[in-house]
Amino acid sequence: DGQRVLAEAGRQDTGHFRAREAFNELRINLQYMNPDDPPRIITVTSTSPADGKSTVAANLAIALVRAGVPAVLVDADLRRPTVATTFGLPAGAGLSDVVVGRASFVDVLHESADPQGLVILPAGQLPPNPTELLTSARFKEAIEALAETHMVIVDAPPLLAVPDASVVATRLDGALLVLDAESTTRDELRHAVQALQRVHAPILGAVLNRVDSKDR
């Protein structure tokens, strides 16, 4: 479907030298995509829930921080959040609570110890109406406030499961589409791209995940 592949990541995604290099390559490609006005707020999404989008989002945020770029990882997958669990954060308030006015950033932002400097905004209390929350002006305002001082990586829902991801992408600088090298079909890719194009969401490119090292 003509999508530019910005990086290929193998099956082993944590601590592995080759994986670290892949996400560093992704960081560089994104930062130099438009040197005069690089994307500040990036939606990371996928066709299906198990394609590895949350792993890619987390590793991209980590790569940015390791390169000296202040970054915030935001869990906007309000139906199936994983960021808090991945980073060992306690259950509590997060993005949804900020958007509805129950909490402020000072209450919900967490700073990672490893890597030091990565800021994490978990999903928070799961709302009954995720789509309405993610299409609200307050969601956009919250993300833009974070982007004043940090690059923002938004872990969004999968495109073909719910409408949330394509809606989120319209409000941010662009979407990064994660594809599973082992399972994503051409039809799924086509439908995902069409979902983004229907709402005029900019597509930054694709990440091919779970690539067998023998195939590289």
Give the positions of each predicted feature.
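Short boundary/hinge segments that flank catalytic cores
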Residues: D1-P70, A76-S96, R102, V106-D107, ...
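Short, well-ordered coil/turn residues at beta-beta hairpins
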Residues: S46, P122, D155-A156, V178, ...
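Hydrophobic anchor at the start of a short beta-strand
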Residues: A71, V152, A175, I203-L204
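Switch II (G3) loop of P-loop NTPases
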Residues: A71-V74, G94-V100, F105, I120-V167
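Short, flexible helix-loop junctions that flank or precede catalytic/ligand sites
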Residues: E111-S112
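Short, conserved active-site loop motifs that form the nucleotide-linked donor/cofactor pocket
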Residues: G117-L118, L204
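Conserved Switch II/interswitch segment of TRAFAC-class P-loop GTPases
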Residues: D155-A161, L172-R190
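Short, structured coil segments at secondary-structure junctions
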Residues: R171-L172, V199
